[in-house]
From Swiss-Prot:
Binds to the N-terminal domain of the chaperone ClpA. This is ATP-dependent Clp protease adapter protein ClpS. Belongs to the ClpS family. Residues 1-24 are annotated as: Disordered. GO terms for biological process: protein catabolic process; proteolysis. The gene is clpS. The lineage of its organism: Bacteria, Pseudomonadati, Pseudomonadota, Alphaproteobacteria, Acetobacterales. Involved in the modulation of the specificity of the ClpAP-mediated ATP-dependent protein degradation. SUPFAM superfamilies: ClpS-like (SSF54736). InterPro entries: ClpS, ClpS_core, Ribosomal_bL12_C/ClpS-like.
Length: 119
């Protein structure tokens, strides 16, 4: 028998018909997983009648990277409205910042309170 002509080659390639060379090649399609933005949380500072205003400004500068003017503005909001937003963060970061603020307030014997709220 002579060489096979292109018309006589089976669709899956040359072979003797016993399936040795009939390899099905396919593409595995994985469902796309959609990444979501994490939920964000506001860190809120609550007013009290005992924590010095300068301490509140210091906390805002130290833990929330606020300038003196920004910190003073937030401190006045807390003082006048009873609550102020220190920043918006992912849950873990917000929780960590609340802990840092509360620890420093306790070390300095201030009753300052911070909490988180879903944004």
């Amino acid at each position: 028998m002579g060489p096979e002509s292109p018309d006589s080659i089976p669709p899956h390639g040359p072979g003797n018909g016993d399936g040795d060379q009939d390899l099905d090649i396919g593409v595995v399609v994985r469902p796309r997983t959609r990444t979501r933005k994490p939920s964000m949380y506001k860190v809120l500072m609550l007013n009290d009648d005992y924590t010095p205003m300068e301490f509140v400004v210091h906390v805002l500068e130290r833990f929330f990277a606020k300038t003196r003017d920004e910190a003073t503005s937030i401190m006045l909001q807390v003082h006048q409205r009873g609550v102020g937003i220190c920043g918006v963060f992912t849950y873990e970061v917000a929780e960590s910042k609340v802990t840092q603020v509360m620890d420093l307030a306790r070390q300095n014997q201030h009753p300052l309170q911070c909490t988180i709220e879903k944004d």
